[in-house]
């Protein structure tokens, strides 16, 4: 399941701009395959960072990951042309910075966060309180 959809991208971009970024043959329509490829590339980039700490791809996509998937996919679409506008480049750089911090463990993705203490295969042992201590047996 992709982290973002074409509808998510259209929430951020006007359809006219999306047509300009995807329509190489001048048909006047959004080319779905180009959008799908940009999203897949964004997902792969996110998985590359998050895969160091999380099981990827995510079954349930955290909202922040969806947001950054959209930002990265839009940046990828602009990269096919002359380059991204300054605000889109800044959003992309912020996404990469965030994902770098996630991979280093400095930022948590919330409920999907891996346990900070790895499970052990060692048995757990509990003892009752001691009846005789060293001080009790000192003069014995």
PLM segments and residue spans:
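Short alpha-helix boundary/capping motifs
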Residues: 37-38, 70, 101-102
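Conserved short "hinge" loops at termini or chain/domain junctions
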Residues: 1-65, 121-140
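Short loop/turn elements at secondary-structure junctions
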Residues: 75-140
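Ordered, amphipathic secondary-structure segments that act as subunit-interaction surfaces
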Residues: 48, 52, 64-84
């Amino acid at each position: 399941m992709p982290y973002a959809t074409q509808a998510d991208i259209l929430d951020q971009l006007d359809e006219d701009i999306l047509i300009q970024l995807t329509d190489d043959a001048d048909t006047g329509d959004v080319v779905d395959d180009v959008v799908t490829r940009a999203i897949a590339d964004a997902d792969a980039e996110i998985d590359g960072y998050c895969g160091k700490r999380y099981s990827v791809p995510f079954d349930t996509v955290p909202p922040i990951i969806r947001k950054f998937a959209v930002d990265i996919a839009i940046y990828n679409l602009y990269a096919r042309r002359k380059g991204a506008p300054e605000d889109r480049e800044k959003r992309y750089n912020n996404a990469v910075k965030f994902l770098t911090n996630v991979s280093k463990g400095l930022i948590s993705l919330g409920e999907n966060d891996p346990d900070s203490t790895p499970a052990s295969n060692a048995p757990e042992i509990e003892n009752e309180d001691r009846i005789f201590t060293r001080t009790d047996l000192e003069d014995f």
